[in-house]
Regions:
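Acidic helix N-cap motif at the loop->helix transition within catalytic regions
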Residues: 24-27, 51-59
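Short aromatic/hydrophobic "clamp" motif used to bind/position activated sugar donors
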Residues: 87
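Acidic donor-binding loop at a coil-to-helix junction in glycosyltransferase catalytic cores
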Residues: 152-161
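Short, acidic, metal-binding catalytic loop of nucleotide-sugar glycosyltransferases
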Residues: 31-40
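Glycine-rich, basic loop-to-helix element that forms the pyrophosphate-binding segment
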Residues: 66-82, 129
Length: 285
C-alpha cells in the first residue's frame, strides 16, 4: 500500500537510468516509466553496450551518454545532467507497475528526516537497504556526496553513509514494480565482497549487515533453496572481502550474465539473486 494522503500537483521528474546491455528489458522499462511517471527527461548513462541498448534508448527519446569509469561515475553523471529538484533512479530491468508510486514517493520524501524513497517489488515482504533500482532522491543531495567514479558494486554505500551521518531515513513504497533480475556468473559474490571492502574498509558491522541483507534477499525470493544457500553465498562474499586485490579488478560486465524472468533457474550454481540494480535486491547492504 502507498502512503495515504491527497495527491499533490506533481512536478515532472528527470528519470536516470544506468545500464549495460539491457536490450532485453529496456523497452518495457521505459514504456512503463512513460506510462506511470510525469517524465521530464529520460537520461541514460550507458557503459558502451554491445547490443541494441543505445538504439532502444534513442527510440524512447532518451538522452544518451556513455562512461567507462564505473557505476559510481554513472550515478553522479546522471545527477549532474538532470535539472529537476528530485530525481528518480530507475534500473533497466525494473518495470514500474504502480500508477500511484510517484505520488506516494513524493509525499514520503517530504516527510521529516527522510532522505530517500525506494520502490519495493511486488510480493516482497522484507524492506532493507538503499538500492537505486526505483529510488527518489533530492538531486542537490546526491551531488553533495563524493561517490568515487570507479565504485562498481558498492556505490550506494556512500549514500547510506551520508544518510546515517545526517540522521535521515529511507522510506519504502510496497508493491511498486517487478524486477526482472539479472543472473550472475561465477565469482559474482567474491566480486561483490571485494567492492564492499574497498568502499567500507574492514568493518565487522558491515560484514554482519551483509549477511542480513543476503538472508533477506533470499527470503524475499520465497525459495527454500535460496534461503538454504545463504551461508554458502556469504562465504563466497567473505572470500572477496578478505582478499579484494584478487577479485576487485574484474570488469563488472564479465560477471553479469543474461537477463531472465523471475523464477527462472540460474545458469550458474548460485541461485538467482538480483543485484539491486533492480529493486531492494542488492547484495551490498
Amino acid at each position: 500500500m502507498g502512503i495515504a494522503g491527497t495527491d499533490p500537483v506533481l512536478a515532472p521528474v528527470d528519470v536516470l537510468v544506468r545500464t549495460f546491455n539491457s536490450a532485453t528489458t529496456l523497452s518495457a522499462c521505459l514504456a512503463a516509466a512513460k506510462r506511470h511517471l510525469p517524465v521530464r527527461r529520460i537520461i541514460v548513462v550507458d557503459r558502451n553496450s554491445t547490443d541494441d541498448t543505445a538504439e532502444i534508448a534513442r527510440a524512447f527519446g532518451a538522452e544518451l551518454h556513455f562512461e567507462e569509469a564505473g557505476i559510481g561515475r554513472a550515478t553522479t553523471l546522471a545527477a549532474r545532467l538532470a535539472e529537476t529538484e528530485n530525481v528518480l533512479y530507475l534500473d533497466s530491468d525494473v518495470i514500474l507497475r504502480s500508477a500511484s508510486f510517484y505520488s506516494d514517493a513524493v509525499r514520503a520524501l517530504a516527510l521529516p528526516r527522510t532522505g530517500a524513497v525506494v520502490g519495493i517489488a511486488i510480493g516482497h515482504r522484507f524492506r532493507f537497504g538503499l538500492p537505486l533500482g526505483l529510488t527518489l532522491l533530492r538531486r542537490a543531495w546526491v551531488l553533495s556526496i563524493d561517490i568515487p567514479d570507479d565504485a562498481q558494486g558498492a556505490e550506494t554505500y556512500f549514500l547510506r553513509r551520508a544518510l546515517k551521518r545526517e540522521h535521515r531515513r529511507v522510506r519504502y513504497v510496497s508493491g511498486a514494480m517487478d524486477h526482472l533480475g539479472t543472473y550472475r556468473g561465477k565469482g559474482w559474490a567474491e566480486w561483490q565482497g571485494a567492492q564492499l571492502r574497498l568502499a567500507a574498509g574492514w568493518s565487522i558491522s558491515t560484514i554482519i549487515d551483509s549477511f542480513l541483507v543476503i538472508l533477506l534477499i533470499h527470503a524475499n525470493s520465497r525459495s527454500p533453496r535460496n534461503v538454504l544457500y545463504t551461508p554458502i553465498f556469504f562465504l563466497h562474499l567473505l572470500r572477496g572481502f578478505t582478499d579484494p586485490s584478487r577479485w576487485r579488478m574484474r570488469d563488472r560486465r564479465t560477471v553479469s550474465l543474461a537477463y531472465g524472468r523471475r523464477g527462472q533457474t540460474a545458469t550458474s550454481r548460485e541461485p538467482p539473486v538480483c543485484e539491486g540494480g533492480g529493486s531492494e535486491e542488492r547484495l551490498i547492504p
